[in-house]
Amino acid sequence: MQKFIIHKGIACPLEYANIDTDQIIPKQFLLAVSKQGFGKHLFHDLRYLDDKESVLNMDFNLNKKEYQNSSILVSFENFGSGSSREHAPWALVDYGIRAIIAPSFADIFKNNALGNGLLTIELAKDEVLGIVDELKKSQDKNIEISLLEKRVFFKDKIFSFDLDDFHRICLLEGLDNIALTLKHEAQIKAYEKNSKSFLV
């Protein structure tokens, strides 16, 4: 998992509330078990005008020239609602999204996202609306995020956010669940060696 310490990138506003996991990655693309390859299907029904993904919907912000190569999304409340599919953060990360800013997230999506290196940042609704409004007006679409300081820097404004210490450390060190387990491999092996074996 890629470390997240400081990131600066183009931010794209998605002015929708209650974006659910089926909108993020529709069910017909969930057959694969690898984390790679889902990015091209991200927001399929919003990004494309046809099922073959050959005609882009140019009214959708991610398809607009000024938001190409976006690595930050700014959206509205309850982002990631719906089913618990982990493919949703996989698709976002595979596309190149490093962080999402919103007033609130669905709990399961938030945990899945953080566990896959995708930073979820909760700001007050009026702060999010202000950022979205400024992104739409300004030529400079870049936002800087410091996980070390737990701050978002945009234009002349600074926004503070909270994140629990466990997920913050995992993101700073680039530790997913497997890497976190392997970090304690020596202790696990010592425990197994010293534990009694029981035969059934």
Curated annotation (Swiss-Prot):
UniProt cross-references to InterPro entries, sorted A to Z: 3-IsopropMal_deHydase_ssu (IPR004431), Aconitase/3IPM_dehydase_swvl (IPR015928), AconitaseA/IPMdHydase_ssu_swvl (IPR000573), IPMI_Swivel (IPR033940), LeuD (IPR050075)
Q: Which reaction does it catalyse?
A: (2R,3S)-3-isopropylmalate = (2S)-2-isopropylmalate
EC primary class? lyase
User: Which superkingdom heads the taxonomic lineage of this protein's source?
Assistant: Bacteria
GO MF term (any one): 3-isopropylmalate dehydratase activity
Keyword check for Cytoplasm: no
Q: Which GO terms describe its cellular component?
A: 3-isopropylmalate dehydratase complex
Tell me, in a sentence or two, what this protein's role is.
Answer: Catalyzes the isomerization between 2-isopropylmalate and 3-isopropylmalate, via the formation of 2-isopropylmaleate.
The protein's name is 3-isopropylmalate dehydratase small subunit
